[in-house]
From Swiss-Prot:
CDD domains: Csm2. Involved in chromosome segregation during meiosis. Promotes efficient recombinational repair and functions in the protection of the genome from spontaneous and induced DNA damage like mutations and gross chromosomal rearrangements (GCRs). This is Chromosome segregation in meiosis protein 2. InterPro entries: Csm2, P-loop_NTPase. One of its GO terms (cellular component) is cytoplasm. It comes from the Eukaryota. Belongs to the CSM2 family. The gene is CSM2. It is found in: Cytoplasm; Nucleus. It comes from Candida glabrata (strain ATCC 2001 / BCRC 20586 / JCM 3761 / NBRC 0622 / NRRL Y-65 / CBS 138) (Yeast). One of its GO terms (biological process) is meiotic chromosome segregation. Its main location: cytoplasm. It holds the Pfam family CSM2. Gene3D superfamilies: P-loop containing nucleotide triphosphate hydrolases. Signal peptide: none annotated.
Length: 214
């Protein structure tokens, strides 16, 4: 699991996906920590498979903090093109927040946690309409955009950090002392040409992420 404190979280972290309750608890803890301070928080959740753990989160939220739902923005991206559009929209929102902060001289900390799930599914959907090479270039472009926005907003008062969720079976090469199953090897072979021998998760983890949460 990634570090619980937002300040300890790397700019771009890969998290081998845990049970929904773990993700719900992580989001809840992020949004409810530092209550009573001036820190504002938002969660951007983007996925391709409607995987937001709403029921698990509802079990954690009580009547006194129902307002946290207002700080969660959920988007669906079926392929890399749609994900790129969402990243562009989020970036424009960050620029506006930055401009507003300068105009009002508002130095209150504003922390944004972006969670992206199903990047491998988006890549496969992109392969339906594009060649391996084109899909690979689109994936690189998406990851460079994410890397850029993290680097741009890496210090207070406005900070932006990203967690990428993948199945453990998709990132076995990044985990210590893991035995690779036959299914994992077949999956690697399937996308060998596009991912230089790696699964999507392994490619992203090796070349773009700061940390792989264990």
């Amino acid at each position: 699991m990634p570090p619980k404190r937002y300040d300890d979280l790397s700019l771009l972290t890969l998290w081998p996906v845990a049970p929904d309750i773990d993700l719900a608890q992580y989001i809840y803890q992020f949004l409810t920590s530092e209550v009573g301070t001036q820190t504002e928080k938002e969660v951007y959740f983007t996925d391709s498979i409607n995987s937001f753990p709403i029921h698990q989160l509802q079990e954690l939220v009580n009547e006194s903090n129902q307002s946290i739902y207002e700080n969660i923005k959920i988007n669906t991206a079926l392929d890399l093109h749609e994900l790129s559009s969402i990243i562009k929209k989020n970036t424009e929102s960050l620029i506006l927040k930055k401009i507003q902060n300068k105009k009002t001289n508002d130095l209150k900390p504003f922390q944004i946690l972006s969670v992206i799930n199903g990047l491998d599914v988006m890549f496969r959907s992109t392969l339906v309409s594009f060649t391996n090479e084109q899909a690979h270039l689109m994936l690189r472009d998406v990851m460079l955009r994410l890397r850029q926005v993290c680097n741009e907003y890496d210090c207070s008062p406005l900070t932006f950090k990203i967690i990428l969720l993948f199945n453990r079976s998709d990132v076995m090469e990044l985990l210590p002392k893991q035995r690779h199953s036959a299914a994992h090897q077949q999956k690697k072979m399937k996308y060998n040409n596009a991912m230089e021998g790696n699964s999507v998760g392994e490619f992203v983890g090796k070349y773009y992420c700061d940390e792989v949460a264990q």
